């Protein structure tokens, strides 16, 4: 900006300001590098000139343009760090109406509603022009909070959280843009400032207010794309707040039960994921569920509405009669639509991962939630097992080959990505009720060996402390029973018969020579640090050997001890 334009801004020449700011804002709309503004203190002079205009109430019609310029200037981290801007930040907080030095927020949304009813005549609905100014000021504050720790602390000192939360919880309707940037600012503060999370959750009871607001949003007959964006930002804020709960366990669990019920309604409403935005809402809801206590996830599956009205029909002579369903997605008298949404989301995420070779960020949260559901409730585990590990029929292919959920999860068992590998292993193991034999049946010992080594059950011992119902869920199909004897437990499938065994044509001397060569090759790999030969110790975990020949001494004794145990 040339000196003449800057001088006119400093002189607050109203007739020239709109053209000057319009030209500047268009020219620098995408500016990210401000090196040219650092010479001759140009950034600071322009900053002060703009805030001089913002301080003049008579130039209120220019404030939206001025704030657009401020938003551009707040991208310059260097200038924000090297100039004293506390007064200007206070001015932005005032323009955004999030400065609340003496605000007292009621403990619950109901108390706030009563307070608003008593002050109905004192409330002032912002005009459209004022709402635009508030939204632009919020955009500037978002940039400042992202760039500067000092600005974040100033926002907390001036009770910015209190004011935003009161506006969110107010019965007064606000434009979507204003609500969106309220949530964006709240997200940045809670993501970057731990003290903000603590204050929002403990001092302001923010989770209760935000849960109520989310519930109100879902009660509306339709949701525009702008409303879906707001819901996404709100879910992100709630994720930050619940990441490290500081409330007492009982108090937090009561809030979590209510929140889980609201998230259930959200998943049911947007579970079809008809648009990318609806899919984003489901993604953020699943992320939030990862922070919810396992004991609260029972709220995802309510009793079917007419389950109690179903007549009890005793079927004599039929040991495994299926209970009558009272609705389309009723399983053991519980509505499992939410679990169906989670499984559909998992299938879509798996398809996306294969098509785009994307990261595992979409898969880890939904697998975490499925693990927690499986561990927390018998009915949920039964349903997930039915969908993920149905009774085996085709055992001609390895478990990791195919496009079913079981096949995908078995492939994850041998991934180098530890988080995804461990989550897939835990989900499958829990669905197998932590039964080693059942896990081998569905995955093959080779795929599950990593889990067994980690758990200390390589020798297929029973897992201690596993607490599951004694009812049998495992019914072998006729196809499985037919081929059961021919299944290779290491591969997890029927091993194709070899046309010719090369050892058949060897003499005993040749076999011994081949065995010695194999020993030498394994020893070379061991010396190079590529492999580590091991035996299973008394704890069921692999114990490295100093030399490959130790196998010759230790293995027969270990096999003898294993036979005695069985």
Curated annotation (Swiss-Prot):
GO terms for biological process: asymmetric cell division; establishment of mitotic spindle localization; establishment or maintenance of cell polarity; G protein-coupled receptor signaling pathway; gastrulation involving germ band extension; neuroblast division; protein localization; protein stabilization. Gene3D superfamilies: Leucine-rich Repeat Variant (1.25.10.10). It is found in: Cytoplasm, Cell cortex; Presynapse; Cytoplasm. It holds the Pfam family Ric8. GO terms for cellular component: cell cortex; cell projection; cytoplasm; presynapse. The keyword Protease does not apply. InterPro entries: ARM-like, ARM-type_fold, Chaperone_Ric-8_A/B, Gua_nucleotide_exch_fac_Ric8. Keywords: Cell projection, Chaperone, Cytoplasm, Developmental protein, Guanine-nucleotide releasing factor, Synapse. It comes from the Eukaryota. SUPFAM superfamilies: ARM repeat. GO terms for molecular function: G-protein alpha-subunit binding; guanyl-nucleotide exchange factor activity. Coiled coil: none annotated. Interacts with GDP-bound G(i)-alpha protein. Does not interact with G-alpha proteins when they are in complex with subunits beta and gamma. Interacts with Frq2 in a Ca(2+)-independent manner but does not interact with Frq1. Chaperone that specifically binds and folds some, but not all, nascent G alpha proteins prior to G protein heterotrimer formation, promoting their stability and activity. Also acts as a guanine nucleotide exchange factor (GEF) for G alpha proteins by stimulating exchange of bound GDP for free GTP. Plays a key role in asymmetric spindle positioning, a step for asymmetric cell division that generates cell diversity during development by activating G(i) alpha protein independently of G-protein coupled receptors. Required during gastrulation and sensory organ precursor (SOP) formation. Belongs to the synembryn family. This is Chaperone Ric-8. It comes from Drosophila pseudoobscura pseudoobscura (Fruit fly). The lineage of its organism: Eukaryota, Metazoa, Ecdysozoa, Arthropoda, Hexapoda.
């Amino acid at each position: 900006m040339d000196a003449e334009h800057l001088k006119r801004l400093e002189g607050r020449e109203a007739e020239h300001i709109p053209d000057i700011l319009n030209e500047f804002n268009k020219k620098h709309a995408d500016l990210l590098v401000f090196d040219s503004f650092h010479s001759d203190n140009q950034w600071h002079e322009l900053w002060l000139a703009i805030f001089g205009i913002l301080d003049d109430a008579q130039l209120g019609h220019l404030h939206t343009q001025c704030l657009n310029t401020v938003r551009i200037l707040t991208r310059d981290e260097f200038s924000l760090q090297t100039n004293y801007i506390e007064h200007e930040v206070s001015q932005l907080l005032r323009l955004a109406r999030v400065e609340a030095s003496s605000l007292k927020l009621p403990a619950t949304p109901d108390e706030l509603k009563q307070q608003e009813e008593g002050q109905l005549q004192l409330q002032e609905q912002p005009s459209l022009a004022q709402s635009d100014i508030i939204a632009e000021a919020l955009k500037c504050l978002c940039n400042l909070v992202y760039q500067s720790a000092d600005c974040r602390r100033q926002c907390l000192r001036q009770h910015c959280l209190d004011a935003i939360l009161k506006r969110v919880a107010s019965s007064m309707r606000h434009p979507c843009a204003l609500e969106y940037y309220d949530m964006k600012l709240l997200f940045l503060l809670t993501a970057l400032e731990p003290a903000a999370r603590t204050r929002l959750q403990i001092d302001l009871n923010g989770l209760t207010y935000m849960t109520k607001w989310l519930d109100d949003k879902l009660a509306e007959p339709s949701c525009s794309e702008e409303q879906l964006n707001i819901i996404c930002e709100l879910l992100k804020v709630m994720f930050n707040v619940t990441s490290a709960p500081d409330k007492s366990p009982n108090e937090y669990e009561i809030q979590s039960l209510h929140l889980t019920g609201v998230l259930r309604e959200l998943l049911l409403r947007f579970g079809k994921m008809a648009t990318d935005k609806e899919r984003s809402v489901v993604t953020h809801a699943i992320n939030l569920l990862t922070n919810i206590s396992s004991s609260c996830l029972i709220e995802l599956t309510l009793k079917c509405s007419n389950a109690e009205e179903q007549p009890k029909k005793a079927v004599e002579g039929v040991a495994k009669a299926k209970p009558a369903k009272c609705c389309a997605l009723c399983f053991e008298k519980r509505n499992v639509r939410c679990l169906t949404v989670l499984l559909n989301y998992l299938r879509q995420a798996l398809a996306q991962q294969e098509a785009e070779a994307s990261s595992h960020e979409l898969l880890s949260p939904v697998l975490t939630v499925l693990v927690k559901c499986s561990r927390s409730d018998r009915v949920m585990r039964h349903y997930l097992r039915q969908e993920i590990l149905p009774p085996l029929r085709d055992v001609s292919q390895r478990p990791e080959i195919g496009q079913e959920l079981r096949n995908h999860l078995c492939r994850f068992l041998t991934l180098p990505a530890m988080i995804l590998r461990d989550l897939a292993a835990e989900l499958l193991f829990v669905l197998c009720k932590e039964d080693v034999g059942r896990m081998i049946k569905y995955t093959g010992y080779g795929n599950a060996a990593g889990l067994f080594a980690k758990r200390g059950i390589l020798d297929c011992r029973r897992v201690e402390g596993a607490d599951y119902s004694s009812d049998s869920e495992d019914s072998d199909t006729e196809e499985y029973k037919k081929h059961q004897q021919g299944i290779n437990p290491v591969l997890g499938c029927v091993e194709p018969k070899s046309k010719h065994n090369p050892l058949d044509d060897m003499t005993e001397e040749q076999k011994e020579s081949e065995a010695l060569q194999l020993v030498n090759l394994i020893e070379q790999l061991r010396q190079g640090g590529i492999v580590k030969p091991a035996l299973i110790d008394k704890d069921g975990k692999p114990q490295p050997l100093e030399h490959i020949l130790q196998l010759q001494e230790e293995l027969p004794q270990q096999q003898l001890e294993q036979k005695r145990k069985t």
